Amino acid sequence: MNTEQFVIAYDVEQDRLRAILPDGFVSLRPVLRINAEIQNGDNGYIEFNTAVEKDGIKGWLNIGYWNGVPFERKGKTVTFRTDFLDISFTGVGIKGACPAEKDNSGCYFIEDTIRLRKPEIISSDKEFCDCEFRWTLSENNAHGKSIGKTLPAVPTEITNIYPKEEFTVINAAEIPCNQVLGAYVVRFER
């Protein structure tokens, strides 16, 4: 399957992430990630994840995913627009790599059981992007815009203990974006 994968990572308050994670998962970094894909040129797909560790295995925890997502191309910009998220990526022509790939054993999906999907081996170059996003599930949702460079997601010590909340897309989308850490697109055959 021909795949264009657009990825954005953004910094959030790590204590807010800790408050929504299911039991058994530990937050690795104060980051939320949106993966938006165009599959075979006509199907849009989005995943929403956060970096975690479970039983000594580091990876991503899927918060939600959607298939059949509408998208539009205008020049170098690709926009995914739904009733819950507006996100656009514009390639800037600079190639690079993603630092989060170094400790990624896959992506956990919580279904009837917890399933770990192994990471894909992608050797294609990544093209950095300018990116802007806005969750639209409620008026308090996260939004942000990239600043033209890639920044690290630095783990933080616990400073605030928040009441436990349900692990849902709505609760994760309400955690404010402090800063977009980076965005890229990679094209590959799946």
Language-model features: where?
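Structured soluble/peripheral alpha/beta segments that form catalytic or ligand/cofactor-binding pockets
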Residues: 1-16, 20-128
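Interaction-surface and assembly-scaffold signal
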Residues: 74-190
